């Protein structure tokens, strides 16, 4: 992460969805984010302590994705997320300038408030 980049971690945490459904939402959003020029990186979040005996090259945490953008493109990304994630239960973490903000949203209104809080946080 460079000095002028902002890291977003998005967790799909709808209790009505099983792990596979959360994973489908992550895959769909990753695919959409990869098509946006302003996004520097996007991907799954690696499990820091995969289960013993896991043969995969590092497992992923279910329902989580991470994306990075530069400061100038953060507002565009948040607008995109607002359009795509309205009405979904998520937790959004924003990391910038060595500080971290985490907000939860369960509706479009809460998501808009969360995005506004994230924008204010980045601007501070």
Tell what function each PLM region has.
Residues 58-67, 71-75:
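Compact, glycine-rich, soluble single-domain proteins
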């Amino acid at each position: 992460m460079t000095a002028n980049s902002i890291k977003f971690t998005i967790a799909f945490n709808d209790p009505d969805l099983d792990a596979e459904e959360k994973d489908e939402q992550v895959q769909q959003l990753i695919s959409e984010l990869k098509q946006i020029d302003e996004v520097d990186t996007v991907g799954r979040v690696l499990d820091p302590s995969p289960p013993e005996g896991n043969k995969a090259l590092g497992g992923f945490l279910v329902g989580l994705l991470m994306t990075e953008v530069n400061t100038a493109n953060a507002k565009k990304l948040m607008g995109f997320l607002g359009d795509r994630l309205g009405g979904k239960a998520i937790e959004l973490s924003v990391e910038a300038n060595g500080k971290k903000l985490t907000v939860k949203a369960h509706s479009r209104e809460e998501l808009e408030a969360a995005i506004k809080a994230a924008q204010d946080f980045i601007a501070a």
